[in-house]
């Protein structure tokens, strides 16, 4: 089957990119590819059997027209000016059978005009982390970019140490970022901001294209998508680590996996990025940061969208966030209905977990085993203050009895939203260390496990992290 690529971005937004081709690595070789995703995209298996090829930037497929995008942004709350694809190249936009498109973005593809002081490369460590994280999030049901392939090489890349140069093929319906809009707003070119908005609406919100108030309606949906995404992050204990405006997806996708982390111990102020000295992007601050970022996006639209309409959309953020968060957390607790005491029970559980440094994922998974007519709970042994847990658990069981469902029905719901497996940093690190020694077995094994996060397991993927695996420091270097 021949893959079809189109050039919408190149044709319709000529001032937003520089056309250039990838720079191949030395002795590049394909070490992992996503068979399930490749099948979904109708990619012939033969493309994965001819060396690094397109996956290593050595060849282009017919119809591809590679380019690096320019955008700007606020980083850690400070205007950073022009940024752009410093090591990534958009190879092409694949046209799928249903009329939708999928960007093929090659990360680590070499120097671009936007590399600034960088070398345009990615390392094996960071490409493995992004591949694992994006696929883990996908199978958790959270909107995200996806990983299609990893290529490693003999090219040295200099970071804190000398590492192997690598490339990741990332795919997504669009790589439109808040930062694209900021770039032209701060260059005082509002007509180009409008062109970006028109492009987005035409191709991704086409049902709004003929609406008189299309820009307000579109921005309102961007707000809603962002609020929903952040709510989902919070419910699974995911910390992004670097929520700069240039890392915010217009479509509400999780984008740019760098120093991310899933909660081990429940620590509301968890900081996964060791460069985040002030805790701006701490776990509990993510909802506020996302709203701040949306306010920056709204500012770029203010030359042609009524401020009252933009503010109305921004005002909807908190309610959308709380609605999505509340619905999911009630499911995690096994509540089939909404009752006035639900928030108090949840907050009391969080307080208990924070005092005890309880494991976030294990706590909710073990809670899924609760039988409402039994005072015994396998979760009890996870707490030191048994009296405090017993008090909470007694009130929790009374609350469960208000919903007329069987234990089996409730447990099935809870186990469908409380994963047994999340991508803890130590699991990723173990796969990385093996891969850096040439052994890809654990990389493939972990990828396979992450496809079924809600299934019970009895291996160390679902155990508490070892002492060395807790609070692994992760930086933005990739």
Swiss-Prot record:
Substrates-to-products reaction catalysed: L-seryl-[protein] + ATP = 3-O-(5'-adenylyl)-L-seryl-[protein] + diphosphate; L-threonyl-[protein] + ATP = 3-O-(5'-adenylyl)-L-threonyl-[protein] + diphosphate; L-tyrosyl-[protein] + ATP = O-(5'-adenylyl)-L-tyrosyl-[protein] + diphosphate; L-histidyl-[protein] + UTP = N(tele)-(5'-uridylyl)-L-histidyl-[protein] + diphosphate
Protein family per UniProt: Belongs to the SELO family.
The entry's active site is 246
Top EC group: transferase
Disulphide-bonded residues: none
- Tell me the residue numbers annotated for binding Mg(2+): 247, 256
NCBIfam families in alphabetical order: adnlytase_SelO, PRK00029.1
Which superkingdom?
Bacteria
Q: This protein is called what?
A: Protein nucleotidyltransferase YdiU
Question: Where, by residue number, does the polypeptide cross the bilayer?
Answer: none
Q: What does the UniProt keyword field contain?
A: ATP-binding, Magnesium, Manganese, Metal-binding, Nucleotide-binding, Nucleotidyltransferase, Transferase
- The residues listed in the UniProt record as binding ATP, with positions renumbered to this chain, are 84, 86-87, 107, 119-120, 170, 177, 256
Show the GO MF annotations. Answer: AMPylase activity; ATP binding; magnesium ion binding
Q: What does this protein do?
A: Nucleotidyltransferase involved in the post-translational modification of proteins. It can catalyze the addition of adenosine monophosphate (AMP) or uridine monophosphate (UMP) to a protein, resulting in modifications known as AMPylation and UMPylation.
Cofactor(s) recorded for this entry are: Mg(2+); Mn(2+)
Q: Give the EC number(s) under which this enzyme is classified.
A: 2.7.7.-, 2.7.7.108
- Give any Pfam family that matches: SelO
Question: InterPro entries attached here?
Answer: adnlytase_SelO, SelO
